[in-house]
């Protein structure tokens, strides 16, 4: 049965004001230095006409060789990349990832990876990051190295190279606006820590680092703990099969409480990671965490992001009372994204996450990634735009920072979110998601409205349409005009369509 919605253009109840950089993103550390990351899916796998497999491997260790490939460093001076990134307006850029935890800062240009590290970052590469952030008028969030090359687990964190990272940054005229200590510390065995590292070691070292930051760079926000706990995966599958398998991949795990209870230096922002599940690449080891593609528009699938937020809110209140929550990695699936991550169907999850998060709390969502792997806004290497790029670009252009109560319960066919207008004019901006694959949603407009309707030829289309016109770059890599149509009366949202409505 189709849903009926009546919008209001009169004053609505204000829920909160949210960060104007709510929509932000990651540039993976391995992109900056060059290195291994997830091997791209084939066009047939993306279209859903070819099943993904891990090359006959029967365990994750054997599979990894088929799942990864080596990529050269990203060119952060690329004119097309900068132009497309700048379209978003001011954002946060997070340069981090597990790769960062094991990277040596090769400020002297030796080209040698010291024992205990796995990768090197050159001074030129770091300056490239700073130039990119400045060119697009962004703010920078980082994490630092903490591995056997830095110190043994029962020794204090060696700050020598870390201090140099800050010195080089500030001598260049840039700033480190925020920092996490390390990426995903819950996974003690695989995140890159010194051998034998414990939750107690983590608490000691986070205090040492954040204490030093607060003393020497008081304007830098201390963010953490980069928690990986929370709701994830298909609950129906989890009810039918054991939840085990995570340990086979992640090894020894620590809870957020175990990491944080021993700390003494307060944080400024609470952070966690959200993925809706795990991709086909890791389904072999964690099948209960992988979603089948025919569930991507279901209420169960779309409920994961707000459930993960609600799980972390009490932890935020405990460890950073009154602080913002930052989702410092967000995507459809851990493991580089699902085969459908780069297609139209993931737009529903992305916009629903932005809407539900802003309804629940204040903070920033760092989409993983800007231009790496299948969940990137842009295709790796060519920087071709994907549906999610245009979806969040419209969000940033249309949806303001004041969040209103729509008085509409979230339900199939009617995920409705209301904000102030981004242009600052009086009125209301709505995002309305019809996630039903079979039924039409009707929307009654109380006044003349500007409508931006999103659709595609198929759910797994790699090109999205705005008011019937394909959203693709022109021959000069310019973003197409994204103009609304003016409507009055009744707006019809066909199955699996989305509309921004501005009044």
Where are these regions (language model features)?
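Histidine-centered active-site/metal-ligand motif
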Residues: 184, 214, 273-275, 290
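Anion-binding catalytic surfaces of enzymes that hydrolyze or transfer phosphate/sulfate esters
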Residues: 260, 264-276, 280-283
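Non-catalytic accessory regions flanking glycosidase/transglycosidase catalytic cores in CAZymes
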Residues: 1-181, 185-238, 244-254, 261-266, ...
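Glycoside hydrolase catalytic-domain groove-lining segments
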Residues: 121, 127, 275-334
């Amino acid at each position: 049965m189709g849903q009926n919605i009546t919008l209001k253009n009169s004053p609505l109840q204000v829920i909160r004001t949210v960060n104007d950089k709510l929509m932000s993103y990651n540039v993976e550390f391995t992109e900056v230095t060059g290195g291994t990351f997830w091997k791209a899916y084939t066009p047939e796998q993306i279209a859903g006409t070819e099943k993904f497999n891990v090359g006959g491997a029967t365990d994750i260790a054997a599979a990894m060789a088929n799942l990864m490939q080596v990529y050269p460093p990203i060119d952060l001076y690329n004119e097309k990349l900068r132009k497309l990134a700048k379209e978003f307006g001011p954002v946060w850029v997070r340069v981090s990832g597990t790769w960062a935890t094991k990277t040596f800062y090769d400020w002297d240009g030796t080209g040698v990876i010291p024992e205990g590290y796995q990768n090197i970052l050159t001074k030129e590469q770091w300056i490239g990051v700073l130039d990119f952030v400045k060119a697009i008028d962004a703010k920078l969030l980082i994490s630092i190295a903490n591995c056997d090359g830095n110190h043994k687990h029962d020794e204090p964190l060696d700050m020598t190279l870390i201090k140099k990272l800050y010195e080089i940054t500030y001598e260049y005229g840039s700033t480190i606006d925020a920092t996490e200590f390390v990426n995903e510390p819950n996974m003690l065995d695989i995140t890159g820590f010194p051998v034998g590292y414990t939750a107690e070691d983590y608490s000691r070292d986070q205090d040492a680092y954040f204490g030093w930051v607060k003393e020497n760079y008081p304007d830098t926000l201390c963010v953490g703990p980069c928690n990986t706990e929370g709701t994830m995966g298909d609950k129906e599958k989890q009810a039918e099969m054991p939840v085990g398998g995570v340990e086979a991949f992640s090894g020894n795990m620590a809870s957020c409480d175990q990491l944080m209870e021993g700390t003494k230096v307060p944080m400024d922002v609470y952070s966690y990671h959200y993925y809706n599940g795990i991709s086909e690449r890791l389904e072999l080891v964690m099948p209960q965490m992988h979603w089948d593609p025919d569930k991507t528009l279901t209420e169960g699938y779309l409920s994961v992001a707000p459930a993960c937020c609600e799980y972390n809110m009490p932890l935020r209140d405990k460890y950073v009372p009154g602080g913002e929550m930052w989702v410092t990695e967000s995507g459809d699936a851990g493991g580089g994204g699902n085969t459908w991550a780069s297609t139209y169907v993931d737009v529903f999850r992305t916009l629903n996450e932005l809407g539900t998060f802003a309804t629940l709390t204040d903070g920033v969502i760092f989409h993983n990634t800007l231009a790496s792997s299948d969940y990137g806004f842009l295709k790796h290497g060519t920087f071709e735009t994907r549906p999610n790029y245009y979806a969040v670009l419209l969000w940033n252009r249309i949806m303001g920072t004041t969040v209103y109560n729509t008085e509409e319960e979230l339900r199939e066919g009617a995920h409705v979110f209301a904000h102030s207008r981004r242009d600052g004019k009086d009125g209301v901006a709505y995002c309305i998601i019809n996630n039903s694959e079979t039924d039409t949603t009707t929307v009654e407009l109380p006044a003349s409205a500007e409508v931006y309707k999103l659709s595609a030829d198929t759910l797994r289309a790699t090109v999205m349409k705005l008011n019937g016109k394909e959203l693709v770059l022109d021959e000069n890599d310019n973003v197409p005009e994204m103009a609304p149509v003016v409507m009055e009366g009744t707006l019809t949202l066909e199955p699996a369509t989305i509309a921004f409505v501005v009044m």
